[in-house]
Each structure stands twice: as structure tokens, then as C-alpha cells.
UniProtKB/Swiss-Prot annotation:
A cellular component annotation (GO) from this entry: cytosolic large ribosomal subunit
Pfam name, any one: Ribosomal_L19
InterPro entries noted in UniProt: Ribosomal_bL19, Ribosomal_bL19_CS, Ribosomal_bL19_sf, Translation_prot_SH3-like_sf
Described purpose of this protein according to its UniProt entry: This protein is located at the 30S-50S ribosomal subunit interface and may play a role in the structure and function of the aminoacyl-tRNA binding site.
Entry's Gene Ontology molecular function annotations: structural constituent of ribosome
Matches recorded under PANTHER family: LARGE RIBOSOMAL SUBUNIT PROTEIN BL19M, RIBOSOMAL PROTEIN L19
Sequence similarity: Belongs to the bacterial ribosomal protein bL19 family.
UniProt key word Cell wall biogenesis/degradation: no
The entry's keywords: Ribonucleoprotein, Ribosomal protein
Name recorded for this polypeptide: Large ribosomal subunit protein bL19
GO biological process: translation
Gene that encodes it: rplS
Cysteines joined through disulfide linkages: none
Amino acid sequence: MNPLIQSLTEGQLRTDIPSFRPGDTVRVHAKVVEGNRERIQIFEGVVISRKGQGISEMYTVRKISGGVGVERTFPIHTPRVDKIEVVRYGKVRRAKLYYLRALQGKAARIKEIRR
């Protein structure tokens, strides 16, 4: 990466991000603006992918809401996310868990590991 770009983005990187990987269940506290007020909306689900590096790193969280799969993609270093909590650590052997989109019920479960 260009040293100038790297020096500009260094100050914008967040340091309060917990370490999490695909397969982990996370609770994302996202700031949502409705009209003139702002509130925190909690989105809890399984991390199915993490891509990019540095300031442009993103992760995708998937949950089932009302029987329908919902996915949201967040930048890791955005100020729109208040905090990220890791609820469970999952044991998977893939970096991208897109195959979970085709599974439902017990087949979509991920084995938990203790840390």
C-alpha cells in the first residue's frame, strides 16, 4: 500500500475490536439514524465471511429472522458500529461459510469451541 495512504488511514483504525473469525456468533451494536434521532440496533448472527485488510476490511453476519435469512455486511473500522461482542466461538474449516445459505434448521448449526 502507498505509504501516504497508509499514514492517513492509521489514525482511523479502531483498537477496540475483539478478535473473531468466520463461524463465530457475534452481537453487533449498530447505530441507526431514524429521522433526527439515533438509536442502537443489535444484530446477532454468525460471521460467514471476513474480507479485505486495513481500513477497508469488511465482515458479513447472517441470522435467521422470522424464518428468513438476513445478512448484513459491516466495515470493521466504521464509527457506525458502537461495539462488537463475541457470543460464541465456532469451529469451522472454511474461511467463507456461504454454504450456510442453503442449509436450514439443525443442519446449519456450527460446533462450538471453548476458549
